[in-house]
Each structure stands twice: as structure tokens, then as C-alpha cells.
């Protein structure tokens, strides 16, 4: 069975191993986007297995390795070691956390030159947990969230953790912004301004690192997910 799954024009996704954080087990997902020059943009990389590497190499050469927020860094080192010529991009806050990694560039509001016109991006700042860079792949109409929007399978939690997951809106019928992220925004005005840019994208799908992708009525889903911020 193939590791990479087609998710639209020039975009593929791959699942990785579950990651344990404070006793909660999160499914993981990465995305591979092929740019117009044939090079690849690797978003939120999962563990690099031999099978995954073979399939990625068959698509094209890796140009960019991207960590979308300061929490998604576990596998950056092995990807950079395997692809030393690729540009390793740091989100806000990650350089201080991972001083052992030699980052080549920093993510900011607005696309980097390497993918301008193909992938747009917005930084949602002012969150005490992490500042997240949200991306939009124009060719497939896909919005890519990392942790701001998520959903974990109910069967991955039990006992008191299941109760916490329900209260945190992590196991609902559709992906949502967990309560902990909602309350961690210290500058909601800045968050709303970033959100308005996201809502202006002609979204067709929403992809996230933890949760079931949304492939229908993406604009409606985004409005529901962030109604707590706009209402």
C-alpha cells in the first residue's frame, strides 16, 4: 500500500506514527506539495521511513522543509540530514527551542520567494501555546492547519483523559479549535485580522496534522470552527 495519498493537484498527504503528549496520543499527518519548478515543499514532516522516502523521491527533489509551528519539530532533524540541500524553515519561536537545528530561513506573514504565487501563508500570533503559520495551496484550494484546528479519534483516549478531550473539544463530530488554544490567545484583535485573511482564501478543502480532512464546504467549516473568535 502506498504511503502517500493523492489529495488534489500537486499535493499528497501521508500519515505518521501517533505522538504522545501528556498521555494523549495524537495521529500525525504531513503534506507534500510539488511546486511549479518540480521541487517539493514538505509541510509538518512525520517520521521518515524508507518507504516514505522512496515515494517522495519519485515525485521530485525536496526544496523546502517546513515546520508550521514551534510544536511540530520532532522529525525535522532526520529530514534535514537526509536532504541537506533543502531549505529548513523555522516558524516563530522554534529557533530558541531547537538550537541544535541549523535553520536556513524564517517563516513570516506572506509567502517566501520559493513558493510565492503557489502557496500563501498567514501567521496567527498572540497565542501563549504557539504561533502557527497557516498555509493555503492555491492549485488544490487546500488550507493547511497544524494544531489550531484538530480532532483526535475517541478510541485513542479513555478514562479521565476522555473527559478532558471532550471538554477541550478535541473529539467532536468535526475538527475544531481546542478550548486551550482559544483561551491562549492574548491578542484576539490580531488573531481576527489573521483569520480574515484566511477566510478570504477560496478554500475547497481543509487539511490538519491531527484530524479528518474536510473536503466539502470548506468555507462553511472554517466559519463554524472560528465562530468563537468572530462572534
What label would you give each PLM region?
Residues 17-18, 37-39, 44-48, 70-71, ...:
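Short glycine-rich, polar/acidic loop-and-turn segments at beta strand-coil junctions
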Residues 43-44, 64-70, 89-91, 144-146, ...:
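Active-site neighborhood of phospho(di)ester-bond hydrolases with catalytic His/Asp-centered motifs
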Residues 55-114:
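Active-site HxH/HxHxD metal-binding segment of metal-dependent hydrolases
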Residues 21, 50, 71-75, 95-98, ...:
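Active-site environment of divalent metal-dependent phosphoester hydrolases
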Residues 2, 8, 46-47, 75-78, ...:
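Cap/insert and terminal regions of metallo-dependent hydrolase folds
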Residues 36-39, 57-63, 204:
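Short, surface-exposed connector motifs at secondary-structure boundaries
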Residues 1-45, 103-167, 193-200:
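Catalytic core of the metallo-beta-lactamase
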Residues 52-57, 198:
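Short, hydrophobic/aliphatic alpha-helical segments
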Amino acid at each position: 500500500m502506498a504511503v502517500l495519498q493523492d489529495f488534489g493537484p500537486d499535493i499528497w498527504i501521508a500519515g505518521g506514527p501517533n505522538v504522545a503528549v501528556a498521555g494523549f496520543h495524537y495521529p500525525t499527518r504531513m503534506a507534500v506539495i510539488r511546486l511549479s519548478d518540480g521541487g517539493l515543499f514538505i509541510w509538518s514532516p512525520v517520521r521518515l521511513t524508507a518507504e516514505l522516502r522512496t515515494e517522495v523521491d519519485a515525485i521530485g527533489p525536496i526544496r523546502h522543509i517546513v515546520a508550521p509551528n514551534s510544536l511540530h519539530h520532532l522529525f525535522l532533524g532526520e529530514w534535514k540530514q537526509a536532504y541537506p540541500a533543502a531549505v529548513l524553515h523555522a516558524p516563530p519561536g522554534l529557533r530558541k527551542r531547537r538550537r541544535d537545528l541549523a535553520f536556513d530561513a524564517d517563516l513570516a506573514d506572506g509567502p517566501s520567494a520559493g513558493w510565492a504565487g503557489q502557496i500563501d501563508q498567514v501567521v496567527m500570533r498572540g497565542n501563549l501555546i504557539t504561533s502557527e503559520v497557516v498555509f493555503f495551496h492555491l492549485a488544490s484550494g487546500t488550507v493547511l492547519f497544524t494544531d489550531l484546528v484538530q480532532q483526535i479519534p475517541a478510541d485513542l483516549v479513555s478514562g479521565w483523559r476522555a473527559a478532558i478531550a471532550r471538554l477541550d473539544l478535541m473529539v467532536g463530530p468535526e475538527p475544531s479549535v481546542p478550548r486551550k488554544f482559544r483561551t491562549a490567545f492574548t491578542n484576539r484583535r490580531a488573531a481576527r485580522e489573521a483569520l480574515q485573511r484566511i477566510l478570504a482564501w477560496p478554500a475547497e478543502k481543509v487539511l490538519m496534522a491531527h484530524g479528518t480532512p474536510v473536503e466539502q464546504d470548506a468555507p462553511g467549516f472554517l466559519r463554524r470552527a472560528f465562530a468563537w473568535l468572530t462572534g
